[in-house]
Amino acid sequence: MQIKHLITLFFLVLIVADQCSAFFSLIPSLIGGLVSAIKGRKKREISTQIDQYRNLQKREAELEELLDRLPMY
């Protein structure tokens, strides 16, 4: 989810909580969930980028090895 969607969802829950007092107990856990979701997403993005970079390095090394094995004409 994009941050815009998370913020929209957060405000929607706040409006509902204003109308119904039962949702007040959910607000702290909602805020904690949003914060952990944003932090978790950043960690996943960074680890994905690192994995993609490693895969790219492996492919480049394999390609160079393959090109070295080809006969010169």
From Swiss-Prot:
Disulfide feature: none
Cellular component, GO, one term: extracellular region
GO BP, one annotated term: defense response to bacterium
Signal peptide: 1-22
Tissue-level expression: Expressed by the venom gland.
Keyword annotations: Antibiotic, Antimicrobial, Cleavage on pair of basic residues, Secreted, Signal
Secreted listed as a keyword: yes
Subcellular location: Secreted
Keyword Phosphoprotein assigned: no
Major location (coarse): secreted
Propeptide: 45-73
Family to which the UniProt record says this protein belongs: Belongs to the non-disulfide-bridged peptide (NDBP) superfamily. Short antimicrobial peptide (group 4) family.
Physiological role: Antibacterial peptide.
Additional facts recorded: The primary structure of the mature peptide is identical to that of TtAP-3 from Tityus trinitatis (AC P0DRB7) and ToAP4 from Tityus obscurus (AC A0A1E1WVR9).
Protein name per Swiss-Prot or TrEMBL: Antimicrobial peptide 6
Organism the protein comes from: Tityus costatus (Brazilian scorpion)
